[in-house]
Each structure stands twice: as C-alpha cells, then as structure tokens.
C-alpha cells in the first residue's frame, strides 16, 4: 500500500507494507544519493532495529552514524536536541546529507525538529516503529520538543522525504505501548472516517485483534491524516480537527509528568472529558461521549485521570497553541465520523475541566 502526499512545495509517499523494513536500505537509495546519514533513535529501538538499518544502508554505499538517546518522553527537549546538533557538527553533516528518524513518536518529533533547524534545514526520512507514530506523528510535517510549560511548545513545520511503515514492528512493542496508539486511531474514526469506526466496532479489543487489523487501521488513519494535511498544511483550519481531545490531553501529559501518562492515553481521556461537557452544553448529540468511553475501555485505554486538578490543568492549557488572546479553539463532533472547530472564551475551558 502507498499513500501519496502531494503538497504544493513538496511531495512524498508513505509506504505501508508488512516486512518492508527489511528493504529499508533499498528504499532509501531510491530517494537519496549516496551521502552521509545520521540515524536518530532511542535506546530501546536501537537494540531492536539499529544494526539492521545500519547494515542495509552501508550495503547501499551510505556513510552511516547513529545517535541514540534514553527512551521516553522526558528526552524530547531542547537539551537533547542541542546534543544532537553537536553530534551532527562533529561528524561534519552538511545540507546535502540526511537524517533518518527510527522509532516512535518521541524519536520522530525530535529528529524532525533537529533536521528542520540544523543549518536551517536538512533532508530527513521517517521510519516509525510504534502505532502512534505510524498512524499520526510521522505524517504531516509537525515537529517539536516539550518545555516545562507545554507539550510541543517549540517546533516547526517540515515535511519528510518519505515515510516507511512496517506493521510487523508493532509485534515488538509492549502491550501498553501498542494500546496507547489506539487513542489516535479511535480519534481518526471519530473525526472523519466512519468506515474506520465500524472496523473498530467489529474488533474485540484484544492485542491480537490490533495486530491482525494493523494494516487496515494504519492505512485508514494515514488517509485521514493525508486529507487534512493537504487541505491545511499549517494547521489553520481543517487540520485542527486532528486536535480532537488533545487540548485536555496535552494538559494531562504535562501535569502527570512527561512519560507518566502516554500520549494516546491522555488523548483518550481528553476526548471523553471534552465530549461529556460538550453534550451538557448541547454542542454535541447525547450519547457520543458514551460511545467514545466504551470504545476506549474495550481496547484497554484509560478513561479516567486519578490526579485531576482542574485549576492546575487550566493553567497548563492556557499555554496551548490553540489559544489566541482570550479565546481558544476546541474540536467537537456534530456526529460520529464528523468534526468541526468551535471557538470559546479561554475562561470557559474551566467548564470543560469539571468532572
């Protein structure tokens, strides 16, 4: 399967195929000239896939370096980015060279941020190995690092030269790491793909059902992401639909401490909380929040956040990128499979944090 992303100033393809990681070197050689490559990965993924990718690339004639950092959301910082800049400079990486992001969402966001800012931008590729990265963060060109104030507070828009997705890599994830990716998959069904939602309804929620249906849910998710990115590359209109559940979700991630609540888990809680309040305000049809709750519960996603503190959460989300002056934009669902953006006074977000 292949998904084409044809933007006005840059086009690339997303290759989705079981077992395609074993052909990654050949894939890269068709996209890039023989040059220097730095693979950016984390301590977990390096053990699983680092040596294989290095050998494949060297076989194709590339000069290869590897930068690995401690796995986890806590590494997605400007401090780690600065260490990578130093590594690239030490190895004399130039604008004719390239970076490959090999790993999950943290690796992809951080590596893409570095690629987009080092020497004002060098080429990069994404090889995502987690479900969250395969369906969401590796696609669309958003890069970023976290700060103590907010998630992804510092970032850029930069498109990769290609994305290689091998669903087989999901088999090496722990159960929690696999399940958290379903938070984003469920979101896609809710905002713009009723067929995907029906696929999820037919699944029994087990780990085996996720792995057995991985190719289909990844493909559907990539198609939804592609549609929104093509229509709104810089997140000013339609693409904002992809933020459903993320305003509250990101606040939960910051409040809990990066990595304590995984991204997809926080999004699941955020979607449920926002939908319940939106229903009470008659902005969404009754029953959708229960549908979301039931779906998240079926797949083993958390549906509550035990450390809920509405005042602290409000202070955190006041730094959200969707805030503008004294207003903030939220995403609501007129019906299953459809989304719209609704602007409210920032102060009204306190209502959406009421349990």
Swiss-Prot record:
The protein's role, per its UniProt record: Catalyzes the conversion of 3-deoxy-D-arabino-heptulosonate 7-phosphate (DAHP) to dehydroquinate (DHQ).
Sequence similarity: Belongs to the sugar phosphate cyclases superfamily. Dehydroquinate synthase family.
Protein name: 3-dehydroquinate synthase
Annotated localization: Cytoplasm
Major location category of this protein: cytoplasm
Taxonomic classification: Bacteria, Bacillati, Bacillota, Bacilli, Lactobacillales
Keywords: Amino-acid biosynthesis, Aromatic amino acid biosynthesis, Cobalt, Cytoplasm, Lyase, Metal-binding, NAD, Nucleotide-binding, Zinc
Binding-site positions, Zn(2+): 184, 246, 263
Entry note: cofactor: Binds 1 divalent metal cation per subunit. Can use either Co(2+) or Zn(2+).
EC class of the enzyme, as a word: lyase
Listed EC numbers: 4.2.3.4
GO terms classed as biological process: amino acid biosynthetic process; aromatic amino acid family biosynthetic process; chorismate biosynthetic process
Catalyzed reaction equations: 7-phospho-2-dehydro-3-deoxy-D-arabino-heptonate = 3-dehydroquinate + phosphate
PANTHER family per record: 3-DEHYDROQUINATE SYNTHASE, 3-DEHYDROQUINATE SYNTHASE, CHLOROPLASTIC
Required co-factors: Co(2+); Zn(2+); NAD(+)
Biological or metabolic pathway of the protein: Metabolic intermediate biosynthesis; chorismate biosynthesis; chorismate from D-erythrose 4-phosphate and phosphoenolpyruvate: step 2/7
Organism: Streptococcus agalactiae serotype Ia (strain ATCC 27591 / A909 / CDC SS700)
Residues engaged in binding NAD(+): 105-109, 129-130, 142, 151, 169-172
């Amino acid at each position: 399967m292949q998904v084409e992303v044809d933007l006005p100033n840059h086009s690339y393809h997303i290759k989705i195929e079981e077992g395609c990681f074993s052909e990654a070197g050949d894939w890269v050689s068709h996209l890039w000239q023989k040059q220097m490559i730095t693979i950016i990965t984390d301590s977990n993924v390096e053990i699983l896939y680092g040596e294989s990718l290095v050998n494949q690339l060297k076989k194709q004639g590339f000069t290869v370096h590897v930068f690995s950092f401690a796995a986890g959301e806590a590494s997605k910082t400007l401090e780690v980015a600065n260490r990578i800049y130093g590594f690239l400079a030490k190895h004399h990486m130039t604008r004719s060279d390239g970076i490959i992001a090999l790993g999950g969402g943290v690796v992809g966001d951080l590596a893409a941020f570095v690629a987009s800012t080092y020497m004002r931008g060098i080429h990069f590729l994404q090889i995502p190995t987690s479900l969250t990265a395969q369906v969401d963060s590796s696609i669309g060109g958003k890069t970023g690092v976290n700060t103590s104030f907010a998630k992804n507070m510092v970032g850029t828009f930069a498109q990769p030269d290609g994305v290689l997705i091998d669903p087989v890599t999901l088999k090496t994830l722990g159960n929690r790491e696999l399940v958290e990716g379903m938070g984003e998959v469920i979101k896609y069904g809710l905002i713009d793909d009723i067929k995907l939602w029906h696929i999820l309804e037919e699944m029994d929620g087990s780990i085996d059902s996720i792995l057995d249906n991985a190719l289909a849910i990844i493909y559907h998710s990539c198609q939804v992401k592609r549609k929104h990115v093509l229509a709104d590359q810089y997140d000013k209109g339609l693409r904002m639909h992809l933020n459903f559940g993320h305003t509250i979700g990101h606040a939960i991630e910051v409040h809990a401490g990066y990595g304590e609540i995984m991204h997809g888990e926080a999004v699941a809680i955020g979607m449920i909380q926002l939908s319940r309040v939106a229903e009470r305000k008659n902005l969404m049809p009754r029953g959708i929040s229960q549908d979301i709750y039931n779906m998240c519960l079926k797949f083993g996603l958390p549906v509550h956040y035990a450390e809920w503190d509405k005042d602290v959460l409000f202070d955190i989300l006041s730094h959200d990128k969707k805030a503008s002056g004294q207003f903030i934009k939220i995403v609501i669902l007129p019906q299953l499979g459809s989304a719209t953006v609704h602007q409210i006074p920032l102060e009204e977000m306190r209502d959406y944090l009421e349990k």
